[in-house]
Amino acid sequence: MFARVFKAMPARASALTSVNASIQARFMATVRQQRTAHERATFTIRDGPIFHGKSFGARTNISGEAVFTTSLVGYPESLTDPSYRGQILVFTQPLIGNYGVPSAERDQHGLLKYFESPNLQAAGVVVADVAEQYSHWTAVESLGEWCAREGVPAISGVDTRAIVTYLREQGSSLARITVGEEYDADQDEAFTDPEQIHLVRQVSTKAPFHVSAADPQCHVAVIDCGVKENILRSLVSRGASITVFPFDYPIHKVAHHFDGVFISNGPGDPTHCQETTYHLRRLMETSQVPIFGICLGHQLLALAAGARTIKLKYGNRAHNIPALDLSTGRCHITSQNHGYAVDASTLPSDWKPYFVNLNDSSNEGMIHKSRPIFSTQFHPEAKGGPLDSSYLFDIYIDSVKKYKASQAAFHPQRDSLPSPLLVDLLAKERVGVQPTIGMQNIAAAATAAAAAA
């Protein structure tokens, strides 16, 4: 009996091998058919090299600032990060798209679980190779399908190492992606410089909205310059109910209704946000409220304090950048995405550097010497990326709670005080957590919820 079984095994193995080979052949034929169906695309750097490849996104032409990221994972988060607004993102990772694109599922707070904003923010995508067959339990579509649906052109089959080498040596440059067209050297007007555009105005919420914590212990005002969903989640998950305001909202006029103020990340040149800088300066002059800023928020806080910002040659965009905590001597691996930095030598005497970049010695944070105000250039919320510095949110929330306790004698009913809105409420906001409600309605909603419970 066993002899017959063992004798039959080679034949069965041979048949199984034949079936596997047939399946593999059909799979590869499908891949080749999909690849050959792609239209020609060109990635052109202004006054620089031209790269030819295949289009796998939207059939449209786009121009912007070409920048690169060395992040190995997290392309859904990177591409939906509002800080990439107006930029053509070049990935150094050789293969992108292998785990597809997840759904727009939301968590218990009503925040997006897998994206940093509802839309794809990058102007264009450049990769060496794109995975057309994806596999992940959260995936609902391919990277190419997502780019096409969002109207974002994407190109594959180009030498990204050569592109990054050029950008590293020459600096971030204007570039464009053209689909199905030849490059015309005389059409320089086709290059659009996003630095000349007020990008923050495009990505900031148009009206205030509120996100409640499950067990609210404090109330934080968030200045939205292009805030990432995981920043909001990092605050709410620590017991902070938040009200998110447009970037140009006069926050100093309503700060007395809040226990803390947070300044978010965002795209572009910080000097474009003059209204925000002015309001922050007035806030620090008129209030002792704790303040925390991240990325662009760090730069805006520095400008409000009287420091200057500089444009970096090619920026820092990665998930593995070392930043040294100057107060403890500890080194953190950080996630970063910025093209500007604070000139630490211009900090006023009542401020001091908090973190420093160990790669290029650029400033990575600052802290006030006597007040609960600090900021970081890197992203402590880091999705995707390392969480070495996520404790900074704990430090901030602790200072917010202490401030709230210190104000209890002066404002015993702080949580129920209405706060007048100084802008018209619109029906649609960037994050879309819930229908926009005025601050004057938040207390009523909270009272109704408590009565129902």
From Swiss-Prot:
It is an enzyme of class 6 (ligase). It comes from the Eukaryota. One of its GO terms (molecular function) is ATP binding. Disulfide bonds: none annotated. Residues 219-406 form the Glutamine amidotransferase type-1 domain. The keyword Ligase applies. GO terms for biological process: 'de novo' pyrimidine nucleobase biosynthetic process; glutamine metabolic process; L-arginine biosynthetic process; pyrimidine nucleotide biosynthetic process. Pathway: Amino-acid biosynthesis; L-arginine biosynthesis; carbamoyl phosphate from bicarbonate: step 1/1. Its main location: mitochondrion. The keyword Mitochondrion applies. It is found in: Mitochondrion matrix. Keywords: Amino-acid biosynthesis, Arginine biosynthesis, ATP-binding, Glutamine amidotransferase, Ligase, Mitochondrion, Nucleotide-binding, Transit peptide. Belongs to the CarA family. Heterodimer composed of 2 chains; the small (or glutamine) chain promotes the hydrolysis of glutamine to ammonia, which is used by the large (or ammonia) chain to synthesize carbamoyl phosphate. HAMAP family: CPSase_S_chain. Small subunit of the arginine-specific carbamoyl phosphate synthase (CPSase). CPSase catalyzes the formation of carbamoyl phosphate from the ammonia moiety of glutamine, carbonate, and phosphate donated by ATP, the first step of the arginine biosynthetic pathway. The small subunit (glutamine amidotransferase) binds and cleaves glutamine to supply the large subunit with the substrate ammonia. This is Carbamoyl phosphate synthase arginine-specific small chain. It comes from Neosartorya fischeri (strain ATCC 1020 / DSM 3700 / CBS 544.65 / FGSC A1164 / JCM 1740 / NRRL 181 / WB 181). The lineage of its organism: Eukaryota, Fungi, Dikarya, Ascomycota, Pezizomycotina.
